[in-house]
């Protein structure tokens, strides 16, 4: 049919001047189809040899799985296409050929070739007509169609919904494109030829639908048979696999059971041995405990007998032993009280003598610097051993004598206070400071070099005073401090020096610290003396 259509199209086209037109869209479709075909053919071919590529190809490419299964079934010989005999093919397509051959030829007016000859000759007559038209260039189309002729319009080929698969769709689309190309050429044929051609065309559509249905039925029957055979083979394989697994499981179960039995026997034997050993140790320990309790009871009975013997002897020959013990305790308490009284009296006497000695040393005038560290150590020892004081751990507040002794030790512990100045030394140092104090009293505030020179010069004209004066000028203060030191009234002297201001106070600062140290020491010694007198 396609050959006849092609020959007929060439006959009709021989009357026209051939014009080559570019069809980029059609070329693109052909290239796309060729590339797609090569891609699918290469993918299917490689999938038959590489299992990993087959999984990747069938999972990501549409229709790849169906094509791979089709090729595998073809290689295995399980695909059986419907076998049609030559008579059946002639019976289905012979009528179409006869109807196409009966179509008359409507070409140029100069052509003398008959319709039957052109169809029978095929491509040869078409080539001759094309050559004639090309060489002579005198072919002229008939401007007026003959009477009884109609325009050839072929409808699109349509298949049933049951036969509408992907391959059939591609074939139908390609065929319909050819039909559209024929319709675009607008062939004019006799009415009876058009009717016979359309009848053959519709017969072709029905024959294709019938062929697709037969092919689908045969494929379904073969698929059902193959699925049944596959199911039967799978079931037989499963039965064999189940039997083998059952046998393996039974063997494994028997093996595990025997191992478990041996393990339980070993565990039971070990537990039995451990329990027997524990019971043996418990029995031995119980036996030892009973022996120990028996020996303890025997010792208790023996002690009881001894205590009874002693009580009997005490009530007999040692009857007055308790009275003697009470008398001895009374005598010992009296002796302890007497010893405490004597010790307290001795400590008080020693403390009194020691304090008197310290006072005597402090009041001496013609002695060098005083060192009373040894006297203070002895004083601390006597205070610590003095009886009658409460215990330091039980007392809530410390005793006054303890606090005073600690202050004395801290006062003399500093390096500069280990040597205490006597009254004679304080008087001599004060005499050396008198000229500096007078000179400093004449200095103006913020005095410079000229101020110091002027103060030095004018201090030569000052008169020295003596005795005790109640005035507050610098000469009266100096004479009053001197007299207080001579009369052993150090507290009054310190009070007058403290009231000095400016450079005079700064010049007398060292002397004031030494005097204060001695004054504090005398005050603490007086407190210790008064505290001793209260004991």
From Swiss-Prot:
Span of the transit peptide along the chain: 1-12
Gene Ontology cellular component terms for the protein in this record: MICOS complex
Predominant location: mitochondrion
InterPro entries per the UniProt record, alphabetical: MIC60
One Pfam family of this chain: Mitofilin
GO BP terms: cristae formation
Biased composition (Low complexity): 120-136
Membrane-protein topology: Single-pass membrane protein
Coiled-coil regions listed in the entry: 191-342
UniProt keyword Mitochondrion, yes or no: yes
Parts of the chain that traverse the membrane: 27-49
Superkingdom of origin: Eukaryota
Topology, Mitochondrial intermembrane side: 50-535
Keywords, sorted A to Z: Coiled coil, Membrane, Mitochondrion, Mitochondrion inner membrane, Transit peptide, Transmembrane, Transmembrane helix
Entry keyword Transferase: no
Annotated segments matching region Disordered: 106-136
Biased composition, class Polar residues, residue ranges: 107-119
Annotated compartments: Mitochondrion inner membrane
Subunit structure, as described in the record: Component of the mitochondrial contact site and cristae organizing system (MICOS) complex.
UniProt similarity note: Belongs to the MICOS complex subunit Mic60 family.
Function noted in UniProt: Component of the MICOS complex, a large protein complex of the mitochondrial inner membrane that plays crucial roles in the maintenance of crista junctions, inner membrane architecture, and formation of contact sites to the outer membrane. Plays a role in keeping cristae membranes connected to the inner boundary membrane. Also promotes protein import via the mitochondrial intermembrane space assembly (MIA) pathway.
Protein name (record): MICOS complex subunit MIC60
């Amino acid at each position: 049919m396609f050959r006849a259509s092609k020959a007929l199209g060439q006959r009709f086209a021989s009357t026209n001047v051939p014009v080559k037109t570019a069809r980029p869209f059609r070329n693109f479709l052909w290239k796309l189809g060729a590339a797609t075909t090569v891609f699918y053919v290469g993918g299917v071919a490689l999938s038959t040899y590489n299992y990993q590529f087959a999984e990747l190809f069938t999972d990501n490419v549409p229709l790849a799985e169906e094509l791979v299964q089709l090729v595998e079934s073809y290689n295995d010989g399980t695909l059986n296409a419907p076998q049609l005999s030559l008579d059946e093919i002639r019976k289905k397509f012979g009528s179409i050929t006869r109807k196409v051959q009966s179509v008359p030829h409507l070409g140029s007016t100069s052509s003398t070739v008959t319709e039957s000859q052109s169809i029978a000759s095929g491509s040869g007559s078409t080539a001759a007509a094309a050559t004639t038209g090309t060489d002579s260039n005198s072919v002229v189309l008939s401007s007026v169609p003959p009477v009884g002729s109609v325009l050839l319009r072929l409808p699109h080929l349509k298949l049933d919904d049951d036969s509408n698969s992907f391959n059939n769709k591609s074939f139908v689309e390609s065929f319909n494109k050819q039909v559209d190309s024929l319709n675009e050429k607008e062939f004019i044929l006799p009415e009876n030829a058009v009717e016979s051609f359309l009848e053959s065309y519709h017969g072709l559509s029905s024959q294709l639908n019938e062929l697709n249905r037969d092919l689908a039925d045969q494929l379904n029957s073969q698929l059902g048979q193959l699925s049944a055979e596959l199911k039967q083979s799978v079931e037989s394989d499963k039965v064999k696999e189940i039997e083998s697994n059952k046998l393996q499981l039974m063997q494994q179960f028997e093996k595990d059971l025997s191992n478990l039995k041996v393990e339980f026997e070993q565990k039971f034997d070990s537990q039995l041995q451990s329990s027997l050993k524990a019971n043996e140790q418990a029995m031995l320990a119980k036996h030892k405990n009973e022996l120990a309790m028996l020996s303890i009871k025997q010792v208790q009975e023996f002690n009881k007998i001894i205590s009874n013997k002693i009580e009997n002897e005490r009530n007999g020959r040692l009857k007055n032993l308790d009275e003697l013990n009470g008398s001895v305790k009374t005598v010992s308490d009296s002796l302890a009280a007497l010893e405490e009284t004597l010790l307290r009296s001795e400590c008080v006497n020693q403390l009194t003598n020691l304090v008197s000695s310290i006072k005597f040393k402090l009041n001496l005038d013609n002695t060098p610097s005083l060192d009373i560290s040894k006297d203070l150590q002895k004083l601390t020892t006597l205070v610590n051993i003095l009886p009658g004081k409460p215990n330091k751990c039980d007392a809530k507040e410390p005793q006054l004598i303890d606090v005073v002794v600690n202050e004395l030790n801290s006062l003399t512990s500093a390096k500069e206070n280990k040597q205490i100045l006597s009254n004679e030394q304080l008087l001599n140092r004060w005499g050396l400071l008198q000229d500096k104090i007078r000179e400093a009293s004449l200095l103006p505030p913020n005095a410079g070099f000229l101020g110091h020179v002027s103060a030095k010069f004018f201090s030569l004209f000052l008169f020295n005073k003596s005795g005790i004066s109640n005035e507050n000028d610098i000469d009266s203060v100096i004479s009053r401090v001197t007299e207080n030191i001579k009369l052993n009234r150090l507290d009054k002297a310190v009070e007058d020096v403290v009231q000095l201001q400016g450079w005079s106070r700064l010049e007398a600062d060292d002397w004031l610290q030494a005097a204060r140290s001695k004054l504090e020491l005398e005050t603490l010694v007086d407190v210790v003396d008064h505290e001793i007198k209260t004991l």
